[in-house]
Amino acid sequence: MALKLVLMLMVALLAAVWSPPAVTASVTYDHKSVIINGQRRILISGSIHYPRSTPEMWPDLIQKAKDGGLDVIQTYVFWNGHEPSPGQYYFGGRYDLVRFLKLVKQAGLYAHLRIGPYVCAEWNFGGFPVWLKYVPGIHFRTDNGPFKAAMGKFTEKIVSMMKAEGLYETQGGPIILSQIENEYGPVEYYDGAAGKSYTNWAAKMAVGLNTGVPWVMCKQDDAPDPVINTCNGFYCDYFSPNKDNKPKMWTEAWTGWFTGFGGAVPQRPAEDMAFAVARFIQKGGSFINYYMYHGGTNFGRTAGGPFISTSYDYDAPIDEYGLLRQPKWGHLRDLHKAIKLCEPALVSGEPTITSLGQNQESYVYRSKSSCAAFLANFNSRYYATVTFNGMHYNLPPWSVSILPDCKTTVFNTARVGAQTTTMKMQYLGGFSWKAYTEDTDALNDNTFTKDGLVEQLSTTWDRSDYLWYTTYVDIAKNEEFLKTGKYPYLTVMSAGHAVHVFINGQLSGTAYGSLDNPKLTYSGSAKLWAGSNKISILSVSVGLPNVGNHFETWNTGVLGPVTLTGLNEGKRDLSLQKWTYQIGLHGETLSLHSLTGSSNVEWGEASQKQPLTWYKTFFNAPPGNEPLALDMNTMGKGQIWINGQSIGRYWPAYKASGSCGSCDYRGTYNEKKCLSNCGEASQRWYHVPRSWLIPTGNFLVVLEEWGGDPTGISMVKRSVASVCAEVEELQPTMDNWRTKAYGRPKVHLSCDPGQKMSKIKFASFGTPQGTCGSFSEGSCHAHKSYDAFEQEGLMQNCVGQEFCSVNVAPEVFGGDPCPGTMKKLAVEAICE
C-alpha cells in the first residue's frame, strides 16, 4: 500500500512537471499602443478577405504578408456567406473562417477579426443576408428589436465558434482585436437618438461576449468605453482617439480604391502610401492596417456597389492574382523594417516636436536606451535641406525620413529602393464553342401574373440577377404610325441597374445606370405591329448596394412608369396593366452552367452578336504555376463559370470614363487622382483560380446578355514582363545602419521563379530620365552602364540569372561621368 502511494505521488509529480503550462496570454491597451502579454507593440496589419481568394491561395498570401513585414492579418466576417438562409450556416470552401485563422496562427501572425456584421467592403448588400430585409418590423442598423436580435445572434455565433476553436490570443490563438459595427458614425448622425442608443447597445453587447481582447469601432467618434474608436481613410495622421487612455489606431489605410464597371482603375503611388503611414507613426500612431493588402476577386455575385467590378484588386501590395505588386510591396516592406527599428523609442514616451522650416518638422522619441527621429517635409513641390542635431538632411517633397538612432537615415518615403515590376498577360489560346440561345417567348413554370409592377429584390430575393417583366399591347389597325413608319417610343423607368427590352422576341435596346447613379430610364423606338404585341423587359441587377442608410428601404427593378408615346391616343401608361413575371433565365433554371445541367438542351454552332446566349466549351489546364485569367475583351456583359463555379460578372463593353493622365506622388491623394484604363474596358481579364481546374476536360460556360464575339475569348497567364530599379548613389540603406558602416546602395533585380533575365533593355548611371518602361539617357551618362549587367565574368552579371544585385558606385560603371552631380542608376531587364 505504501509503495502504491509512493508511485501515485511520483506520477502526480511527473504530471505536474510535464503538463503544458496554462495559457496566460493577455491583450490590453493604453494611450500608447495595444499591449500583448505586457509588451507595448507597434503593429503593422493588412486586410486579406478569405472569400476573395481560394483556400489554396491563403498560405502563400499570408506568407507574403509576413515577408512584407506584417504582424497582423485583418478580415471582415461575411454574414451573407455564412448564413445564406435563417439558421442555416456555412463555413466551408472559401468561407472556412476557422481554417483561414489557423493558417494565420501557423504563420506566426496575429489576427484582427472585424465581425461587424455589417461590413460595407464593396460586398453585396454590405454583407447582410437578403432574407434579413424581410424580417417583419425590421429597420437596419438602428435601435430596432428585430435587427438587434438577428445581429446579436450572429455575432454571438461567431464569437462562440472562435472560442470553441481556441482562436483568441488569451486562449493561445491569433485574434488580438475584434470589431463591432463598421463606419457607423455618419449613420448615427443621420439617425439621431435611435442611432446613439444603437451604438451603446452594440458596444455593450460585444464587450459582454467576454472575448478577452479589445473591441474597436471604426469611424465612430463616440465609441463607448472600453471600445476603441479608430480611423479609416487615405490619411489618418490628424486623428485622435476619443479618450486619453486609448491608442491611436488606423483600421483602414486605403492602399488604392475599388474599380466600378464604367469607371477608370485607381492607383495609389507607393511613395504617397509610405508617406501617409510614416506620418501616422510619426504622430503617435501605433496600429496601422492596409486596406487592402490583397484585394482578390469578387467571385460569383458577391460584388456590391452596385456596379462594382469582379476584380477587387484595389492596387494592393499583393495583386488580385496573388503576385507581388512592385514597388509598392517592397517599398512598404522597407518602411516596416525602419519603423520596427524605432519601436522601443516609439512606445516609450511622448515626442519632442521641432519646426525645421516652413513645411518641415522633426518628431523625436526617446527611451532609456534608444532614440528615434522622423524628419518630415510636407511641402508638395520642393526639396528641403534641414539641419537636425547639427547635421544636414536632404528631404524630397512630400516625404518623411526615418532615423532609428536620431542620426542615420535608413529610409525616406519618396526614395524607392525596391524594384518596379511590369506585368504581362500572355496569350495561351482560344476555345471552340457551342451555343444555346434563350427563347424569349418561352416562360418557365415558375411564372406568375399580377396587375402592376413589382419590386425586383423582394421578388427574386437575390437568387438571380434577372427578372422578366412581360406584358402585351394591342395595337389597332388604324394607328397612324403603321402608315408613316414613325414608331412609338417605349419609355421604361427603373430603380436599377440595367434593362434589356425585347419587342416581339427581338432585342430592341438596352439601358443601364452607373456606380454614381444606378437608376436609369430606357427610351427607344418600339417596332409594333397591328394586333397583339409582346413587350418583355429583362431587368438586371449588378450587385446590391453596400453602403447607406436603412437597407430595408432600398429597391431595384422596373418600378415605372412604363409608357408608350406616339399613339393616336397620345400616351399609354402600361404600368398598371397585367404583367407576367419570371425569376431568372431559363438557362439558370436548367443549370446550364453545370456539366449535368448542360445536357438538358440541344447546343448548336456558336454565332456572334447573339443576345441572351449561353456558350460552352472544354479545355485542358495550361501547364505551369502562373496565375490564369480569361480575356473577355470581345464580349459584352454576362457571367462566367468554370467547372460549375462562378468566376463572377463580366462587362468589358462598359468602357471606363474619367481623366487619365500622369501620376505624381506629391500632394494629397484621392481616388480620382491617379487613374488608368480610360476609354478601355474597366475590367478586361477575369481571374481563373488554378485550384478550380482539373488536368483535362475543364468545363467553361459563358452567359452573354448583349451579344459578343466568343471567338475572341482566350486564356492568358499573368507573369513578369520586366523589372526595373532606380536608385540614387547616396540612397539610405538598412544594411549600412545595421553594420554601422558606410557603403554603397545596391540595385536588386528579381524575375519570377522559373524566369531569367534575357537582356538588359536599358541601363544608365548618371542622370537618366523617365520611368520604368520609358527610361532615357540624361545629359550625364556612364558609357559602361550596361557592362555591369551584361559583361561575362563580372560577379554581378544579371543576364541569364533569376535575380542579381549591382552596387551603385562610379567604379562599377567605368568611373564618375559627371563629378559634382548627384547621380542615380536606372535599369530595366526583360524577364523570360
Curated annotation (Swiss-Prot):
EC category: hydrolase
Catalytic residue positions: E183, E252
Subcellular location: Secreted, Extracellular space, Apoplast
Signal peptide: 1-25
Catalytic activity: Hydrolysis of terminal non-reducing beta-D-galactose residues in beta-D-galactosides
Gene3D superfamilies assigned: 2.60.120.740, Galactose-binding domain-like (2.60.120.260), Glycosidases (3.20.20.80)
GO cellular component: apoplast
Domain (SUEL-type lectin) ranges: 741-832
Name of the molecule in the record: Beta-galactosidase
